[in-house]
Structures are given as structure tokens and as C-alpha cells.
Design a protein with these regions (language model features):
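Intrinsically disordered, low-complexity terminal regulatory regions
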Residues: 1-131, 137-141, 145-149
Length: 152
């Protein structure tokens, strides 16, 4: 598991400048971003995902959600003890998300409502967070990079 500190003002400033360059020039600037983020931005561009697009991609019906959860029941059941343990350790402010190999959310524990102010409206069961659909994001990028991450 990799622990990445993401609240550094310098990192935020560099990412903002890189995002502005991407917006103005349509290219990912070389050498500015961490390697995995740089690679993710490039993959997102190749998928045709605009870096500033807003997507809400939950499943269309409760029947689809029932099928999704039923087809992932073994994973969910195996992960529940770990999710409960992490939720206990994190307290009320944390957020734990379990997703399948397609980056579709299967379980959410914690304060997803706290993210709504940052434009993340659909941290919900059945929402897809793959890079190919949404671009760079912690869940989709971790799956592509085959890394488990904790962001603080």
C-alpha cells in the first residue's frame, strides 16, 4: 500500500499550472506531475475524456444495481470485515470505497456527502469511476496502475 500526501500547497499549485497548460495547449506538460498522474492524464486524453468534464454515471435502475451487487457478492462479503475495520479506525470523517475491476462502486462507508462541494456528486453504489469514462481519479487510476492507495 502506498501512502501519498496530497495536501501540499506546492503540489496543488503545480497541478493547477499543469491543468491550465493542458487546457490552453491541449498537451500534458512534461516533468511537472507525479509519474502515475502524468500517465493517467495521457491515458485520459487518449480515451477522449476532457480533463474538466463533469460526469455522473450511476446505474440506470435498481434492477441493474441488484444484478451488479449479486454478481459481486463474494467480493463484497470478503471485503466487509476489512471495510468495517477501516471505518472504525478512520472515524466519522473518512471515506472507504470498494469497487470492482471495472471501477464500479460496490460499497461506500463514511462521509461521501462531504465531497459534494468539490463536484463529486455520485460517490454512490453503481457509479463507474474508470479512467476511460471519467479521466484521472483516485479509484480508476489506482486500478489501472494496480496500486492500493491511501490519500491524506
Amino acid at each position: 500500500m502506498t501512502l501519498i500526501k496530497t495536501n501540499s500547497p506546492k503540489l496543488h499549485r503545480e497541478a493547477r499550472l499543469a491543468r491550465e497548460k493542458l487546457h490552453l495547449e491541449g498537451e500534458v506538460p512534461d516533468g511537472v506531475l507525479r509519474a502515475e498522474i502524468d500517465a493517467s492524464w495521457r491515458r485520459s486524453l487518449s480515451h477522449g475524456v476532457h480533463f474538466n468534464a463533469k460526469h455522473e454515471l450511476a446505474l440506470e435502475s435498481s434492477a441493474s444495481l441488484d444484478v451488479l451487487l449479486a454478481s459481486n457478492r463474494l467480493l463484497i462479503d470478503a471485503a466487509l470485515p476489512a471495510i468495517d475495520y477501516l471505518a472504525e479506525r478512520q472515524g466519522k470523517e473518512g471515506l472507504i470505497i470498494l469497487a470492482n475491476s471495472d471501477a464500479t462502486i460496490l460499497a461506500v462507508e463514511g462521509r461521501a456527502d462531504r465531497l459534494k462541494g468539490s463536484g463529486l456528486q455520485d460517490i454512490t453504489l453503481g457509479a463507474c469511476w474508470s479512467e476511460a469514462v471519467r479521466g484521472t481519479n483516485a479509484l480508476g487510476t489506482a486500478l489501472v496502475e494496480a496500486l492500493s492507495l491511501i490519500h491524506i
